[in-house]
Amino acid sequence: MNCSIGNWKHTVLYLTLIVSLLYFIESLISHKLHINYNKIRLKRSPNLPLRFRDDGTFKILQVADMHFGMGMITRCRDVLDSEFEYCSDLNTTRFLRRMIESERPDLIAFTGDNIFGSSTTDAAESLLEAIGPAIEYGIPWAAVLGNHDHESTLNRLELMTFLSLMDFSVSQINPLVEDETKGDTMRLIDGFGNYRVRVYGAPGSVLANSTVFDLFFFDSGDREIVQGKRTYGWIKESQLRWLQDTSIQGHSQRIHVNPPALAFFHIPILEVRELWYTPFIGQFQEGVACSIVQSGVLQTFVSMGNVKAAFMGHDHVNDFCGTLKGVWFCYGGGFGYHAYGRPNWHRRARVIEAKLGKGRDTWEGIKLIKTWKRLDDEYLSKIDEQVLWETSDSFLK
């Protein structure tokens, strides 16, 4: 009898301990198990369609190679000894805010290596912090991937999915194709982050509801093996087919030519190396790191006729523009402080501005595209302003 009572007491004691332990564990993690309805919200979308301003201008800020890590604890690279102690990712954030306040862009184009994957333990958190100033100011933005973004906790598909769902983003995972039986489906295409952004004419103008400016974004890949050799990625044939198909779709019948277009991607094409032997504007300070494959990008741009310039990153201490067969290829210049650079060479950003032509009583299509850079110095110095394209033609039938 005494033995039975002892066993019963032990059982009650064990059960009490187990219940207490479970209650303790639940108290520690309950905030993670319950939905906080106050934090559930929809993506804040930009005002679409994007369009030119009342003054007939549209301005794009290109941000190349932020290489963002984990904020304050991620130190700068290649800065002066006197700057190093207090230099971190926050310097990159501060520079982005300065550029936004100075230029007031209509769109920000993040052209890859937005985060430096190996320097963060949480890719999503790093992206939120890196892109944060664009969201704070409510500015529409678009992003493509570089060759370092995916080296952390998210793969390339997951990264583009996340980027497309962030506030004020116009980024897309890949282009959609209309299917009468299935609805919109994603086109089978190489990479993640191939998409088109249309810009409409100025409010109240005859082209207010028409595409007058096309912006094409591409995934230029990561690393690949070609004939046993390791090389960088490149824009593939499927992407170029999509570009050609898309560029002829959906333009207003009021415009007698395809609107001018720009392209944005991370890794330069092979032909950019040839610019060393030509006049260029800016600085050509390092070799062009690109694929050994001649991708057909230049030939496609030339055959289309309306792609006026392409903007890229990847080689941080190159910031030049040069022209190949009538198409400009421009580096953004290294933006981020955790990216490699040169101690006496200021981080920088590129600005692109398009201006509409003025008819007798209305804004017409684009008349001029120009670009310049700003340095992250005391004065946010403006350098290397140049015209990329200009026309005297009328755009209307």
From Swiss-Prot:
Residues binding Zn(2+): H266, H314
Known glycosylation sites: N91, N209
Comment on bound cofactor: Binds 1 Fe cation per subunit. Binds 1 zinc ion per subunit.
Family, similarity comment: Belongs to the metallophosphoesterase superfamily. Purple acid phosphatase family.
PANTHER family: INACTIVE PURPLE ACID PHOSPHATASE 28-RELATED, PHOSPHATASE DCR2-RELATED-RELATED
A GO term from the CC aspect: extracellular region
Protein name from the UniProt record: Probable inactive purple acid phosphatase 28
InterPro entries per record: Calcineurin-like_PHP_ApaH, Metallo-depent_PP-like, PAP14/16/28/29
Any GO MF annotation of the entry: acid phosphatase activity
Tissue: Expressed in roots, stems, leaves, flowers and siliques.
Highest rank taxon of the organism: Eukaryota
Binding site for Fe cation: H316
Species, as recorded: Arabidopsis thaliana (Mouse-ear cress)
Protein localization: Secreted
UniProt-annotated binding residues for substrate: H314, D315, H316
Keywords linked to the UniProt accession: Glycoprotein, Iron, Metal-binding, Secreted, Signal, Zinc
UniProt-listed CDD domains: MPP_Dcr2
Transmembrane segments: none
Subunit structure: Homodimer.
Residues annotated as signal peptide: 1-30
Cofactor(s) this protein requires: Fe cation; Zn(2+)
